[in-house]
From Swiss-Prot:
It comes from Staphylococcus aureus (strain NCTC 8325 / PS 47). The lineage of its organism: Bacteria, Bacillati, Bacillota, Bacilli, Bacillales. Keywords: Amino-acid biosynthesis, Arginine biosynthesis, ATP-binding, Cytoplasm, Kinase, Nucleotide-binding, Transferase. Substrate binds at G40, G41, R62, N154. This is Acetylglutamate kinase. The record marks K7, K212 as: Transition state stabilizer. Its main location: cytoplasm. HAMAP family: ArgB (MF_00082). Pfam families: AA_kinase. Gene3D superfamilies: Acetylglutamate kinase-like (3.40.1160.10).
Length: 254
């Protein structure tokens, strides 16, 4: 089976181009199995604000106490994931919404106590995911369940998507509200792994792009063949990436 992991950023979900679903249907008709992983940061922040809870981040990761976890779980599973599945189904693309608890899809462990209920994935139930792919488009949110303490945890959606891609040795398309990796305000078409640290040291890659490219580097070193970072707001973006039409930035081991 040939898989493509497609990570849709929370900032893109409300402005996702409708052609994305048609592109995914086309992939499936060619026996390529897309797996969707999504975040939901803006929706979580709005839900927290409605409860007068101030979001708190350390090193770019959301600190998740018990109250924040409860709201995050409800937002990602009941609101964002359900809406995305409905959108796919309305376009005659049968989808199924999943979190880590469903079919014991992925195992997690606690990341670091200072972050509270933040987890990292440690194992993927490939058999379950492969079976589901034959029937539906899996749409996976970033809520995991820790079998050891019986608690739900929030996972960074990029981290989860890269982990799934590495585990399946599949390419990953990271769709967000940015067009790719910018160097001197220009999107570079390719970013070899050997150049990443140099660009970071020189300040050419900075801010939120640093963890994205470092996670991409780690994914490629662990089995993912390539990572493409591109805008999710462009028409037929998935088809363009699949056809190597030089959109966004391709990160690869060369």
């Amino acid at each position: 089976m040939k898989f493509i992991v497609i990570k849709i950023g929370g900032s893109t979900l409300s402005d996702m181009h409708p052609s994305i679903i048609n592109n995914i249907k086309h992939l499936r008709s060619n026996n390529i199995y897309p797996i969707i992983v999504h975040g939901g940061g803006p929706f979580i922040n709005e839900a927290l604000s409605n409860q007068q809870i101030e979001p708190h981040f350390v090193n770019g990761l959301r600190v998740t106490d018990k109250a924040t976890m409860t709201i995050t779980k409800h937002t990602l599973i009941a609101d964002v994931n359900t809406a995305l599945v409905a959108q796919f189904n309305q376009h005659q693309c049968s989808a199924i919404g999943l979190c880590g608890l469903d079919a014991q899809l992925f195992e997690i462990t606690s990341f670091d106590q200072q972050y509270g209920y933040v987890g990292v994935p440690t194992a993927l139930n490939k058999d379950a995911l492969q079976y589901l792919c034959t029937k539906f488009v899996p749409i996976i949110n970033s809520i995991g369940f820790n079998n050891h303490d019986g608690e739900f945890y929030n996972i960074n959606a990029d981290t989860l998507a890269y982990f799934i891609a590495s585990s399946l040795k599949a390419p990953i398309y990271v769709l967000s509200n940015i067009a790719g990796v910018l160097i001197n305000d220009v999107v570079i078409p390719q970013l070899p792994l050997v150049d990443i640290h140099q660009y970071i040291e020189h300040g050419d890659i900075y801010g939120g792009m640093i963890p994205k490219v470092l996670d991409a580097k780690n994914a490629i070193e662990n089995g993912c063949p390539k990572v493409i970072i591109a805008s999710g707001n462009k028409p037929n973006i998935i088809e363009s990436i699949y056809n190597n039409d030089f959109v966004g930035t391709t990160i690869l081991n060369s």
